[in-house]
Amino acid sequence: HHDGFCLWPSTKSTHTVAKSPWKDGKGDVVRELSDACREAGLKFGVYLSPWDRNHKDYGKPEYIAYYRSQLRELLTQYGPIQEVWFDGANGEGPNGKRQVYDWPRVFGLVRRLQPGAVMFSDAGPDVRWIGNETGSAGDPNWSTVDPAAVPYPGAEGERVTAMLQHGD
């Protein structure tokens, strides 16, 4: 899910359904899903991976503007969005590049364009990750996270791990 392929016809990328043979390049998976959710009375949410292994500027300051422009497309073209899901992917691995995303500006963009949406990540700011890939919460697990300890998605360290497992 970090390959950068856009399931909507993004104007910011050529790595998108618009350049694929699916529906002769006229398809939009995100549109179909958002419409289906509304028809079924379900609330709609989106995920946009911050780590795009396909983009040439990943790891450079220019990438941040690109990422936010894609997020802006998702937040403005599909009606009300209930949840925006983020993870802290920072180019892990021996060939990865670490990217600083400026999360406060990303969170601000969501608040401005979709004020009713909740944001999920390991750092919140609204709903936080349980702290592991198994979905098993530690015991006890309080619902709060100290923003100073987990200031952004992808923050690392023993205190971060403990807080995600048990709360503050």
Task: Briefly describe each language-model feature range.
Residues H1-D168:
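Mature catalytic domains of secreted/periplasmic carbohydrate-active enzymes
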